[in-house]
Amino acid sequence: MLVLGIETSCDETGVALYHTQQGLLSHALYSQIEMHGEYGGVVPELASRDHIRRLLPLIRQIFAEAGVSLRDLDAIAYTQGPGLAGALLVGASVAAALGFALKVPVLGIHHLEGHLLSPLLSDPAPAFPFVALLVSGGHTQLMEVTGLGQYRLLGETVDDAAGEAFDKTAKLLGLGYPGGPALSRLADEFTRSGQSARFELPRPMLHSGDFNFSFSGLKTAVLTLVNKHEMTPQIRGAIAQAFQEAAVEVLTEKSLAALAKTGLTQLVVAGGVGANRQLRSNLDRRAGTIGATVYYPKLEFCTDNGAMIAFAGAMRLESGESESSRLGKFTINARWDLEMQEIGREA
């Protein structure tokens, strides 16, 4: 089965072709970072218009690279939500039009399910069941995953997502857009320089006794330091390091607590913050002490991409999704809880 995946939930236009026997045949991604950098954040209307410009050329590109034609296509999967409504509509419209013209199934995929399943594209891949840490600019959640579509929410952020906190802290430090990766680079450079840590920031909700997160207080603590100190390169680096260490410690310890609570030994980390080197290092080190294994997507699949949508669509269709009432529906869900998707995809 050959599946075309389309991802347009925010500021990346991603497409991919996944074959259930041959694996990932081709994929392409266009990032709008440079365009939105001028405004310091994503402008929804500009994002939608750029998806319109980029999507069809990218689709033609991956078909040419894979050496297949539209007639070879068996199904289309697109990001149904959550995300920016206008951006989602672009991908949904193209998917629906192609599906109608080619007479192939069209399936809407939950964006977070795509991220959650993306480590299964790697080798070695995790097997169900596992705990998933979904950590990105819009979401921070711990899920117990017992099978495809079987997701139980263990905990989530009560305010800012981790990636959002990275971006906002970077802005306070005067770093460029996107701020999260810039902050991580600065923190890593400060650590490698051998300078001693100057600041200790709070670890919000570290000992709350549940699996929820909070990052707004951490951001406020950074603001206090910024207002108190002259922003020399050394001070800026020290604050970045202190912030990253605090955020990473909370993410690490909550994830290990979730493994202990569920009795599972596999942790899947997905989403843009999953590319953070210190987070990966800490998780690997701490998981090793309890006999657990951590799985990550390839770095190129940590951010939004079409490969994860094509793969999730293929898994859904192979599991019998073709009998689903939501197949062929032209819908988007800008706000959509992953845990609720089996109860109501159109909620």
Curated annotation (Swiss-Prot):
Cofactor section? Fe(2+)
What does the entry give for GO biological process?
Answer: tRNA threonylcarbamoyladenosine modification
Top EC class of this enzyme? transferase
Q: Which Gene3D superfamilies match?
A: 3.30.420.40
* EC annotation from Swiss-Prot or TrEMBL: 2.3.1.234
Q: Does this entry carry the keyword Transferase?
A: yes
User: What's an example of a GO molecular-function annotation for this chain?
Assistant: iron ion binding
Keyword Membrane in record: no
Keywords in UniProt for this one?
A: Acyltransferase, Cytoplasm, Iron, Metal-binding, Transferase, tRNA processing
Pfam families assigned = TsaD
The UniProt record gives the binding positions of substrate as: L134, V135, S136, G137, G138, D167, G180, N276
Q: What is its main location?
A: cytoplasm
Q: Where does Fe cation bind?
A: H111, H115, D304
Recorded GO cellular component terms are: cytoplasm
Q: Which NCBIfam families match?
A: gcp_kae1, T6A_TsaD_YgjD
Its biological function? Required for the formation of a threonylcarbamoyl group on adenosine at position 37 (t(6)A37) in tRNAs that read codons beginning with adenine. Is involved in the transfer of the threonylcarbamoyl moiety of threonylcarbamoyl-AMP (TC-AMP) to the N6 group of A37, together with TsaE and TsaB. TsaD likely plays a direct catalytic role in this reaction.
Q: Report what the protein is called.
A: tRNA N6-adenosine threonylcarbamoyltransferase
Q: Which organism is it from?
A: Nitrosospira multiformis (strain ATCC 25196 / NCIMB 11849 / C 71)
